[in-house]
Amino acid sequence: MKMLKIFLLFLLFWLQCSLWIGKNGILDYIKIYKKIIVQKKKNEDFQIRNNQLILEIERLNNAIKN
């Protein structure tokens, strides 16, 4: 019975390590999540810039036509 307890504790420890610091674990998830937030902000900034450029092009095209 004592060996079973030791084995189960070791198994629990190993699973927790895998969950937290293993490949695709929680720490990896947190890093990727932060990168996604930064990239979304960059994408929003680029979208605003693109919209401004589109408006400027349309304004210039209208100025040429008139």
Swiss-Prot record:
UniProt topology in membrane: Single-pass type II membrane protein
Gene Ontology BP annotations: FtsZ-dependent cytokinesis
Cytoplasmic side, ranges: 1-3
Keyword Cell division in annotation: yes
Primary localisation category: membrane
Function: Essential cell division protein. May link together the upstream cell division proteins, which are predominantly cytoplasmic, with the downstream cell division proteins, which are predominantly extracellular.
Protein name: Cell division protein FtsB
Annotated source species: Buchnera aphidicola subsp. Schizaphis graminum (strain Sg)
Lineage, broadest ranks: Bacteria, Pseudomonadati, Pseudomonadota, Gammaproteobacteria, Enterobacterales
